[in-house]
Amino acid sequence: MKKQVIALMLFVLYAVSAVAAPDRFAIVPSEGDNNISIVDLNAEKVLKTLPTGKTPHAIAFTREGKGYVNNRGSKELTVIDGNKFEVLKSIVLPATSFQIALSPDNKTLAVAYKDALKLSLIDTATDAIKITIAVGKEPEAAFKGAMMKHPYWTKDGAYVYASDNVNNTIIKVGVKTGSIAATINLPGPNHYLHPSPDGKLLYAVNEAEKAGTSVTLIDSVTDRIVKDVQIPLEAGEPGLLHHGDFTKDGKYFFVCNEGGRTVAIMDTAKQDIVKTLKAGMGAGHPGMTRDGNYFFVIQHKDNVITVIDIAKQEVVKSIPVGTGKKQAHGGYFTPDGKFYYMINAEDNNMVKIDVSKMDVVSKIPVGKSAMFFSIKEGNDFPSTE
């Protein structure tokens, strides 16, 4: 009888542990292999690969699980089923995409291009291009770099902001009319738009400028520039801002300089930089832990994750993640906050970090030069950017 009780207890413990481990997958585009790896993060192995176009970069998933892959080496999007892990189709585009973004209601996909000043809007029900809008004057000579970067949707889905990096402007496009509602002149090319927590301002994170690099604050109602905040850099440090994030209370905005190693901290009330920190080389993406206490900063020219204590505004640790010095754009904290996933793109590994210990616990081989990944958590597709 005693053996039976023990056996029953072991069975119950096994069953509980099985229930406590929901399905968790990473969907990883490989720019070097022209495919997508489907990774079971619980088993820590690749289940299958899916073919894509050339140089697949990012993925945008609808809530139902339809995924759009932007291929940066061919004029097409690859559409996948994120539940069955199958390729559905390809969507032919008028140019080569740089980035994509879904509308808040998931009904429309905005496509910004690297080799054309155009913005396409795609109906996600039919996968047909509804309209393609010219957003600026095309360059007369060969243009170095991507002409556009990340598109940004307003909360109500009525407008899309698109960066015109040829003419250093942001274009506001009305979705219903397909017309340009506003043109905002910037001191340099824009990389990303972050809405303030109260929605009143847009923080335009700019790249290289004559004066260095800056964050331009834009009134989200009038589309007028409120202030251009210059970022203090070390002597000789190139300016090339990339991404940022707000603290949970909205009092500070941390922004990363990919051109060097500076992470600048802006007081959002004063609209001024109050402190700078030194991260790894190519500081790119700050990801906040679930409890709001730390930023884990991904670098694009280094082999460490920089951990910043938000309250103290200090770097508390550098976590080595391999030998390669190129990391993918994005990371993911598990819902319980215990683990953080990122990719070392030169080592071709997905890295799992224990958040409390701030140490690497495992590495999962993935495809070559993966620069982005998406997550399937149960039936959900949470953001990794």
Where in the sequence are the language-model features?
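Predominantly soluble domains enriched in secretory-pathway, periplasmic, or organellar proteins
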Residues: 4, 11-385
